[in-house]
């Protein structure tokens, strides 16, 4: 399934824009700051979550606009998706599917979305939180229901942490209820992550070493024990009260990535190797999504071509073209995409998008 038409209203730098896209490569070219990434972000908002920038909803509304925004799409099978906010509730996301109100998590039933952005170059060197979000995005593309477990787990954990940090002894009955929720959703999160990492690791292991480095994957940190998580949390209350936060659960996990051939942690690999590792993970995961869900995910690749040498760039275009699916790419000049073949070419200039 692909995006056939994308319509933006008061989204980022766009007062109004309508984009017609073909089923394969969609290439957006323009100067830095022209608004190319804003278009990719709009596409990413057609799934659960806060999109490829992870921004607050209010930040997405156009400066000088009415205060809300709208992103709408017509898919290749005539399904209509829409999301946005109103000026009266700039941080309350609204979603419609074929004109009917729906939840943001329901969007995952229609589209699987994966992306690579320059900000992700720091994925292996920064803290575990970013890698957990990346892992959950990989899981979500295969198991859309994962979003519900993550959001409910996070809400219960925030409530428990607030109780633990309050003065005086926490309400035991309220803790029991929160820990039951954490146990239910935390177990589902941990199991889904483990399934995805196992399947993805096997697929990556079957890939050649070149041109994209093969990654070895594992989950580190908190590991589910035979004791249910709710019970583990109940027994750990005194420790957690002293710490002022919850110390057990899937929010304490990390995605460990290493260079398989060199047996070297990704954090210690060169910048070029890290890019190749990340690209290899995303490409293998796209194949896994296609296998599990029967349709290719939409790939959003922001400035990826500019950071690859000519050999890897050509290999990337060949691999993407052979695999199929819709791939949105951005770059400052058309020459970066020489050899890409048939594509929808779009020129982006200061809040306007035109066929190139």
From Swiss-Prot:
<keyword id="KW-0235">DNA replication</keyword>
<dbReference type="GO" id="GO:0006260">
    <property type="term" value="P:DNA replication"/>
</dbReference>
<keyword id="KW-0227">DNA damage</keyword>
<dbReference type="InterPro" id="IPR003395">
    <property type="entry name" value="RecF/RecN/SMC_N"/>
</dbReference>
<comment type="function">
    <text>The RecF protein is involved in DNA metabolism; it is required for DNA replication and normal SOS inducibility. RecF binds preferentially to single-stranded, linear DNA. It also seems to bind ATP.</text>
</comment>
<dbReference type="InterPro" id="IPR018078">
    <property type="entry name" value="DNA-binding_RecF_CS"/>
</dbReference>
<keyword id="KW-0547">Nucleotide-binding</keyword>
<feature type="binding site">
    <location>
        <begin position="30"/>
        <end position="37"/>
    </location>
    <ligand>
        <name>ATP</name>
    </ligand>
</feature>
<dbReference type="InterPro" id="IPR001238">
    <property type="entry name" value="DNA-binding_RecF"/>
</dbReference>
<keyword id="KW-0963">Cytoplasm</keyword>
<comment type="similarity">
    <text>Belongs to the RecF family.</text>
</comment>
<dbReference type="GO" id="GO:0006302">
    <property type="term" value="P:double-strand break repair"/>
</dbReference>
<keyword id="KW-0234">DNA repair</keyword>
<dbReference type="InterPro" id="IPR042174">
    <property type="entry name" value="RecF_2"/>
</dbReference>
<keyword id="KW-0067">ATP-binding</keyword>
<dbReference type="GO" id="GO:0009432">
    <property type="term" value="P:SOS response"/>
</dbReference>
<keyword id="KW-0238">DNA-binding</keyword>
<dbReference type="InterPro" id="IPR027417">
    <property type="entry name" value="P-loop_NTPase"/>
</dbReference>
<dbReference type="GO" id="GO:0005524">
    <property type="term" value="F:ATP binding"/>
</dbReference>
<dbReference type="GO" id="GO:0005737">
    <property type="term" value="C:cytoplasm"/>
</dbReference>
<protein>
    <recommendedName>
        <fullName>DNA replication and repair protein RecF</fullName>
    </recommendedName>
</protein>
<dbReference type="Pfam" id="PF02463">
    <property type="entry name" value="SMC_N"/>
</dbReference>
<dbReference type="GO" id="GO:0000731">
    <property type="term" value="P:DNA synthesis involved in DNA repair"/>
</dbReference>
<dbReference type="GO" id="GO:0003697">
    <property type="term" value="F:single-stranded DNA binding"/>
</dbReference>
<keyword id="KW-0742">SOS response</keyword>
């Amino acid at each position: 399934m692909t995006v056939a038409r994308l319509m933006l209203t008061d989204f980022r730098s766009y007062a109004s824009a309508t984009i017609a896209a073909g089923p394969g490569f969609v290439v957006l070219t323009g100067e830095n700051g022209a608004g190319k990434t804003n278009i990719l972000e709009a596409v990413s908002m057609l799934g659960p979550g806060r999109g490829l920038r992870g921004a607050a909803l209010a930040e997405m509304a156009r400066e000088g606009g009415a205060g809300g925004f709208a992103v709408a799409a017509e898919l290749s099978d005539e399904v209509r998706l829409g999301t946005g906010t109103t000026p009266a509730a700039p941080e309350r996301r609204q979603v419609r599917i074929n004109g009917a109100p729906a939840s943001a998590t329901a969007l995952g039933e229609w589209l699987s979305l994966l992306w690579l952005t320059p900000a992700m170059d720091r994925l292996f060197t920064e803290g575990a939180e970013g890698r957990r979000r990346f892992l959950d995005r990989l899981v979500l593309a295969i198991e859309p229901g994962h979003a519900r477990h993550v959001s409910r787990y996070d809400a219960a954990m925030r409530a428990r942490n607030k109780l633990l940090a309050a003065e005086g002894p926490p309400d035991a009955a309220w803790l029991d209820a929160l820990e039951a929720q954490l146990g239910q959703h935390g177990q589902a999160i941990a199991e889904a992550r483990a399934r995805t990492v196992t399947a993805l690791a096997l697929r990556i292991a079957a890939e050649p070493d070149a041109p994209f480095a093969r990654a070895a994957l594992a989950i580190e940190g908190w590991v589910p024990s035979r004791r249910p998580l709710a019970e583990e949390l109940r027994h750990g209350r005194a420790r957690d009260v002293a710490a002022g936060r919850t110390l057990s659960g899937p929010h304490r996990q990390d995605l460990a990535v290493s260079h398989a051939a060199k047996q070297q942690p990704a954090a210690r690999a060169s910048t070029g190797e890290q890019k190749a590792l990340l690209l290899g993970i995303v490409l293998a995961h796209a194949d896994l999504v296609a296998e599990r869900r029967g349709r290719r995910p939409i790939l959003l690749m922001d400035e990826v071509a500019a950071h690859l040498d000519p050999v890897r760039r050509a290999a990337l275009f060949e691999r993407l073209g052979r695999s199929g699916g819709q791939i949105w790419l951005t770059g400052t000049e058309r020459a970066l995409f020489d050899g890409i073949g048939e594509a929808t070419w779009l020129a982006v200039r200061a809040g306007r998008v035109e066929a190139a």
